Amino acid sequence: MLKVTFLVLAMLISIPMKAMAEDPLDLDGFAFPQPAASDLGKAYKLWATYYYLPEIQEDSGTIALRDMKGQELGPRLTLKHWCDTAMEGSVKINYKNGDIKTFNYQGVTNDYFVDCKSIFPRHTGIGKTKFREANGVYGDGLDDYILSPYRTLATDVTYITPGTALYIPKARGAKITLPNGRVIIHDGYFFAADKGGAIKGSHVDVYIGVSKSAPFFSWIGSNESKTFEAYVVKDQKIIQDLLELHSIK
């Protein structure tokens, strides 16, 4: 019996565990310096929308999150929460036992269609969305990037290449109060680490984490006529630091 116990323990220890990312907000001081003109490159005239991470309680509804094979992932959501999750691309689930998991967009299939027409009349295709457990605390972006609140931009990858750091002067000095009471004074730097089907050309989507709206970023006008200036960052140290905030440690 003792040998069996040791064998089971050895097997458990040898099973590779999923890498868990640290919370980017715990690592981010939002304290990059104001750039010199020589540290900035190409200028863009952009317009912005924002997206966020829905946060809900376990088993709040009856509609399952499913993976690409149609298998249930565990959580069951209300129609509104499910459609919000499909639209935003990720969801944070608070379990009754205290666990927290984030699930992320994986792809689309035609089976197990969820009718979101009553929630998003112009985006009925999101009902085909399938999910997986995310690597990042706030969800995953392109390739191996994780999402970092108030830093990540979803871009048209043919217009702004993933891995590009951008400085937005109008974002510098923005005051953001987090749910835990921490106050961030934004330094104006962002990082292209995600994409979206509706993101084309000069349109960027700003990730705001668990905030539900973005009054602190007045330059986000959700309208292509409301443009602002952004500049490519050339400072390699800042680029590397932003990359690390979007990487699993």
Residue positions per predicted region:
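Bacterial N-terminal signal peptides
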Residues: T5-S14
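Sec/Tat signal peptide C-region and signal peptidase I cleavage site
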Residues: M17-A21
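Solvent-exposed, well-ordered loop and adjacent helix/strand elements within mature globular domains
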Residues: E22-K249
